[in-house]
Amino acid sequence: MARINVVVSFLAALAVVQAAQLLNLDGQKDAVPGSYVVVMNDGLSGLDFESHVKSMAKVQKANALKRDFDNTADGVKFKYNINGWQAYSGKFDNKTIQSILDDPRVNYIEPQRTFRAFGWVTQDNAPSWGLGRISHTSRGRMDYVYDSSAGENVTVYSVDSGVDISHPEFEGRAIWGVNAADNSDVDQIGHGTHTSGTIAGKTYGVAKMAKIVAVKVLDAGGQGTNGGIIQGINWAVNHARQNNVTGKAVMNMSFGGGLSRAINEAASSAVRAGIFMVAAAGNNNEDARYTTPASARGVCAVGASTQNDLKARFSNWGPTLAVYAPGDRIWSAMPDGGRDVMRGTSMAAPHVAGVAAVLISSEKIGTDRLCERIKELSVSSIQSPGADTTDKLLYNGSGQ
């Protein structure tokens, strides 16, 4: 009898250890009430995943009936499979969340929070200097020198607020991909058009022959959620596979927020799928290890520098940064054929995405080696980079 009790106690303890975890946010100010991302255990079959989702949909429906058809919690919105990483997101009531937690197929549940664009401050009549800086080892030059391949046959996914794909800057090389933010398939704030112009615009772009695919995850307020962002990443990975561009694809993420385990895991899964991931480090002058998606494993995190090779006062810093790039007073495209100047790590990241696209086309380098190659080429120029932070400034290796 004693042996049976020991076995029962062990199994009970094992069940506790294996129970799914409901993660807490580091502060609730960015929380989206009642919205969650549910992440499944590694190795779960597709059939088991679908079985779980259907089961929880029934639970949600039953709970809704008990609430007298209150639709404030409306169930699954997005399902994800990013290189084997499986999850889903939506709105669920507390009873449904408890049922999800009790399912042994679930790894953890993360409350949804908002993430924001990292480039907002504008200043009229500022000079455009970033292209000249990244193609010379010393500052002060305004000419842009680059390899003639110019990112040709490379696809860059602009995960942002959308892109004005008809803007003359893109010369027909930009297409609309997916909208995971709202019901408006346009760039309402200009942020995504600006960053994409830096990546691949004919005038302002680093990789002037690369293709842009608009993946909208930020709404008219410049905000998005865990679920929408992961949906954008999921869509981009599937699109890259369907179009045979894995290994020749870049994803730029000029946004961020507090730590999200789910987004970080989704981004890392995209890296393993053959997408080179670039992320803005953030604009809070703090350690980027506590910012998502810049802190994700395998993501190339970028801080912002000034025209004087200083760390921009707003830029995040820390050991997670791969490199600094121009991010202060950057001119680029805006919707309806316009142009404007912005500053932020949002403006720095697309310089790196553009250089990555050029390196893929010119050196035929694999996406798994790109961040290291970019760091190899970069020059030690940043003054006062921050504690435990690289002093490397982006350089495209032009020889100038």
UniProtKB/Swiss-Prot annotation:
<feature type="domain" description="Inhibitor I9">
    <location>
        <begin position="35"/>
        <end position="116"/>
    </location>
</feature>
<keyword id="KW-0325">Glycoprotein</keyword>
<feature type="glycosylation site" description="N-linked (GlcNAc...) asparagine">
    <location>
        <position position="244"/>
    </location>
</feature>
<keyword id="KW-0378">Hydrolase</keyword>
<feature type="active site" description="Charge relay system">
    <location>
        <position position="191"/>
    </location>
</feature>
<dbReference type="InterPro" id="IPR037045">
    <property type="entry name" value="S8pro/Inhibitor_I9_sf"/>
</dbReference>
<dbReference type="GO" id="GO:0006508">
    <property type="term" value="P:proteolysis"/>
</dbReference>
<keyword id="KW-0732">Signal</keyword>
<comment type="similarity">
    <text>Belongs to the peptidase S8 family.</text>
</comment>
<dbReference type="InterPro" id="IPR034193">
    <property type="entry name" value="PCSK9_ProteinaseK-like"/>
</dbReference>
<protein>
    <recommendedName>
        <fullName>Subtilisin-like protease CPC735_047380</fullName>
        <ecNumber>3.4.21.-</ecNumber>
    </recommendedName>
</protein>
<dbReference type="Pfam" id="PF05922">
    <property type="entry name" value="Inhibitor_I9"/>
</dbReference>
<feature type="glycosylation site" description="N-linked (GlcNAc...) asparagine">
    <location>
        <position position="396"/>
    </location>
</feature>
<keyword id="KW-0843">Virulence</keyword>
<dbReference type="Pfam" id="PF00082">
    <property type="entry name" value="Peptidase_S8"/>
</dbReference>
<feature type="active site" description="Charge relay system">
    <location>
        <position position="346"/>
    </location>
</feature>
<dbReference type="InterPro" id="IPR000209">
    <property type="entry name" value="Peptidase_S8/S53_dom"/>
</dbReference>
<comment type="function">
    <text>Secreted subtilisin-like serine protease with keratinolytic activity that contributes to pathogenicity.</text>
</comment>
<keyword id="KW-0964">Secreted</keyword>
<dbReference type="InterPro" id="IPR036852">
    <property type="entry name" value="Peptidase_S8/S53_dom_sf"/>
</dbReference>
<keyword id="KW-0865">Zymogen</keyword>
<feature type="propeptide">
    <location>
        <begin position="20"/>
        <end position="118"/>
    </location>
</feature>
<feature type="signal peptide">
    <location>
        <begin position="1"/>
        <end position="19"/>
    </location>
</feature>
<dbReference type="InterPro" id="IPR050131">
    <property type="entry name" value="Peptidase_S8_subtilisin-like"/>
</dbReference>
<dbReference type="InterPro" id="IPR023828">
    <property type="entry name" value="Peptidase_S8_Ser-AS"/>
</dbReference>
<dbReference type="InterPro" id="IPR015500">
    <property type="entry name" value="Peptidase_S8_subtilisin-rel"/>
</dbReference>
<keyword id="KW-0645">Protease</keyword>
<feature type="glycosylation site" description="N-linked (GlcNAc...) asparagine">
    <location>
        <position position="153"/>
    </location>
</feature>
<feature type="domain" description="Peptidase S8">
    <location>
        <begin position="128"/>
        <end position="400"/>
    </location>
</feature>
<dbReference type="GO" id="GO:0004252">
    <property type="term" value="F:serine-type endopeptidase activity"/>
</dbReference>
<dbReference type="InterPro" id="IPR010259">
    <property type="entry name" value="S8pro/Inhibitor_I9"/>
</dbReference>
<feature type="glycosylation site" description="N-linked (GlcNAc...) asparagine">
    <location>
        <position position="252"/>
    </location>
</feature>
<keyword id="KW-0720">Serine protease</keyword>
<dbReference type="GO" id="GO:0005576">
    <property type="term" value="C:extracellular region"/>
</dbReference>
<feature type="active site" description="Charge relay system">
    <location>
        <position position="160"/>
    </location>
</feature>
